[in-house]
Amino acid sequence: MNRFTVPVFVLLIFAVASASPLLHTVEADGTEVVRQRAQAHVFEWNGNASNVSVHGEWDGWVAGTPLIETAPEQWSVEMPLAPGMYCYKFVIDDVWTMDDGNPYTGYCGVTENSVARVANATLPMFSATIADDALTVLWHAGASGAGPSGTPVALNGATWDDASWTWTYDLSGLPDGKHTFHVQGEATDGTVADDLLLPFWRGPGADFVWDDALIYMLMTDRFVNGNTSNDPAPLPEAAQGADWMGGDFAGVTAHIEAGTFTDMGVNALWLTPFNTAANGTGLAADGVHEVSAFHGYWPVEPRGVDPRLGTPEELEALVDAAHAAGIRVLGDFVVNHVHEDHPYHDDHPEWFNSGCICGEANCDWTEHRLECLFRDYMPDVDWKQRNASEAMIEDVLWWIETFDLDGGRIDAVKHVDDLAITNLAVRINERFETVGTDMYLKGETAMGWAGHDLAANANEYGTINRYIGEHQLDGQADFVLYHATSDRVFTGGEEDYMHLDYWTARSQDQYVDGAVMVPFVGSHDVSRFASRADPGTADEWNQWAEQGLPGQPGTDEPYAASLQAHGWLLTIPGAPMIYMGDEYGEYGGADPDNRHMWRNATERNDREQHLHENISAIGAVRAESEALRRGGYASVHSTPDVLVYQRATADASSLVGLNRGATASTVTLDAVYADHAAVFGSPAFDATNLTLEIPAGSVVILSNESVFASNATGNETQPPDVPGCTDPAADNHDPAATVDDGSCTYPSVDVPGCTDATAENHDAAATVDDGSCTYPPVDVPGCMDVNATNYDGSATSEDGSCTYPPADVPGCTDANATNYNANATSDDGSCTYPPVDVPGCTDVNATNYDANATVDDASCTFPGPDGPTPDGNETGGEDDVTPSEPSERNERDNNAMADLLGSVGTLGSALLLGLVLMGLSWAIRRTAS
């Protein structure tokens, strides 16, 4: 994912506020510890300041900890924090500021702060590197300093070096494709180490970069039905085209293995969400029609595979087949919302916004983008809630790890807080980019094209760029280029090829450096390209049957426009995306009519099949051409109907010519192109006179790359033809054939019926099972517990085979607690929290002393003296007392006696009077005697 800075050596640790010393050598019990992970969290800041301190949640923000200037303008401090997550900020010369060196942020209350994620440093850990054919894994002791108890299972066969605490694993014997090692182990004292995931590729895929990708986007339910047993019952209330149609993982896998994607040059698949989606239907945006969740964007489970698409095992098989074929797989992650039946909505209502409905009155899509709801049954996730954001991130990590995905597409990017994208990207980098394998994150930030003035499009580019960077997305769908060209140039023709050239070039200089953008001409969100390019019709934007939906085009124009558009799309920079069916010109109106079932070669007409063959051939050339995948873009020649441009690296060059005109066009080239020769199309290229004739309505490609075979003159590079059947759908498909010789044979026309000979209504003439088979009642043993990982919906009797996910891990699950445990799955009530400050008067001499107060708020009041002080300033100092007159002294004596009597109380006064009388009586008797 991180093409902006690719780490060579990665340690499995939580991201810290800044770089920290992770390795050092210590002595433990008299035995030298070769390597130990850092035992304190390091905060760092670089810059010119008089004083720098860090304040955070760990002590309730009460006191700051000063950073020490260890070198000019380099400040740091080590803090032994307990494992958990802490909001914090730096205070730099009395100014509170975020930590620019730490991309991970979060909200504590209503304020965004930097977030320190502190790992459990007492545990051991692993780190790893790959160089050439050697995988090197290092052991880092925990607090005890203990070494490993043995070799991890994932490294079975590796060589251990006791002196360096290092395993070395020879990769040379591994087959081509993707491998993922899950390294786990424990120390000799029994302490379990933090695990390490090591995804890497061998063979041709090892040097893949995402500029090499040709992405094929498919909606699983609408691709191919490979397993009719998982088809759901029809929903009568669903509008036409808005019900489930039976496509599944098995259908995708079958076409991976048949070479359907590889033959087109496709090396990356983007599948729509496969988490369990809502049952039934929901009201469409028009408020009239009912639609189902076949698309997957209404999730009702955070980690459940939708059984209507297949089983977890079938999804694993799909990914394994793709990797074996050198194809990456991208998930589609819905992070903005859930369906109202999702458990998060019921269990944690505080995790969701209570906004208006996007697009309704006083609810603008832009102004209210962060809190508005797409529909009233789609609660909007509030990423400012830390527990919500961490749960959503953990779910994405689970999907990627469980099914060994290679990245993902993030849905509705601009509708979530910025921290959603940043924090998600940081966590994916840490977990999966451990030995240099790039995980690609592609975003959907729907923007437009604001006119011919580049300045007018600054906001369009800027909004898309906002989410791309080193700790963010790797790229996004290029919506500006799409809106500038797809309809304006290719389907409508209102703009010419000079306009096309200009805006293609702008996509190379207006986005973040290093971004891998995804250009496209069609998608699952807009009407089909072929219908938009169909002249003389006005139904291309209709979406419901009663409006009248587009039919299959009956002229050449839509297919000619599609060839021009895809010839351009597959030869410009970026990771271009083909929407399933566009490769042969699938027709349709707006959603859901743009989501027809994919059709194979036997179901296409000649125009569609010819378009498919041409687009597949261009994709195959792109797959072989380094220049077309990784080269820069340079305009060579442009007129209203003709465009010639070069794609070139330091070592390779390809020339692309597009002519949408009705007549051939001749272009004179520079001498630098004399060594080029045709690799696609039928150009007339004279290398001596440097003239290139591009036939009318055609796409041509020339290249000087040695990967394309050349003849003795070097002027033509057509490889030797291999005749045969090139259609993968045919019975006699020949993968080695390069030219179709018309020999393809196909199965007879499908006859629907029950094909199962064991069924009561078996039809011997049927060739395609239509699901009508009926059977006598029979027990089907299997796991009937819906909570089990291997739940079998078809089972009728329990056979004791149920397996379950790992037991809950008790611990503190509240991220705000000081002892928060990120690995805990159930809260055991052990959470502890920093003391909460109670303001009040803490002076025991005050009249309003508060014994519960912990912080004095200056509210104390005190009793005054018995009268005003002589000068009224209440100081009571020595200088405020003046001498008293005798009468005043007697009065004071009397007052003193009264005060004395008053102080001893009624009983005391009686006793005192008794003593006085006794004394008087004694005196009288003494006198009398």
Report the location of each language-model feature.
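Aromatic-rich carbohydrate-binding modules that target alpha-glucans
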Residues: V34-M85, V91-A119, G150-W165
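Surface-exposed, short loops/turns at beta-strand junctions within beta-sandwich domains
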Residues: L81-M85, L171-K178
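C-terminal low-complexity, Ser/Thr- and acidic/Pro-rich disordered "stalk" regions positioned immediately N-terminal
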Residues: P834-V838, S859-L901
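A cross-kingdom C-terminal cell-surface attachment/processing module
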Residues: T906-R925
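C-terminal beta-strand-rich structural cap/linker in extracellular carbohydrate-active enzymes
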Residues: C87-Y88, F126, T688-G714
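Active-site-proximal helices and loops of the catalytic beta/alpha 8
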Residues: V319, I327, E394-L397, E401-D406, ...
